[in-house]
Amino acid sequence: YLNCSFLTAAWPAPKSAQPHSVPDFHARMGSGPIVLMSYNRVNGYAAECERTVFLDEPSPREPELFVLVMEARSLALSMVRPGVSCSSIDEATQELFRARGYGEHILHRTGHGIGLGNHEQPWISCGGSDILQENMVISVEPALYFDDIGGFRHSDTVLVTNNGYELLTRYPDDLEHLIVKRQNWIAAIKGALIRKAIHF
C-alpha cells in the first residue's frame, strides 16, 4: 500500500525572482524564466524537483544564466559524498557565482535535508556544522535571482551513497527540453515525464 501526495506550483517571471513568494492567483504565464516545483510524498517521505522553464525562446542573456546555475549544480553534486561538510558545498557554489559577478543575486543556501519534512537538517549552508553521511537525503538547489528577469533554480532530491550520490528525481535538465512552446507546454512536460518514467 502506497500513500502518495503531490503538490505542484509555478512561479512566473518576475515572481520567480522571489524564491518563496506566492504568485497572484490570476497571474499569467509569460515566456519565462518560470520556476516549476513539484513536492511529492510517498508513505510520509518527501522529495522535491524544480526546473526553470521557458514558454518561448529565451532572451540572449537567459541561456547564459541557465547554464551558470547548471554549472553550480554540477559543482555541488560533484562534492556530495560522506564526510563532506555541507558548508563547503554552499561556499563552493557561492564562490562560483561571485567569481562570475553574480554574488548579489544569491538569495538562499545551496540545499537542505529532505525526508519526513520538506526542509530539515542537514543544511547545505555557509557557516553550518553539518557533515554529510551515507543514506542522508538532501536537495541540491543552487540558484540566482534577478528582479528584472526572474529566477533560475533547479532542485533535485539526492541520496548520499557510500562513495558519492544518486539522483532520486529524474527529469530533463537541459535547456533544449525546458523550452516548451506556449500552446503545447503542458503536453511537452507530461511527455518528458512519461519518457523518463519508461526508462526508470
Protein language model features and the residues they cover:
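Active-site neighborhoods and metal-handling regions in enzymes and metal-associated proteins
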Residues: 1-200
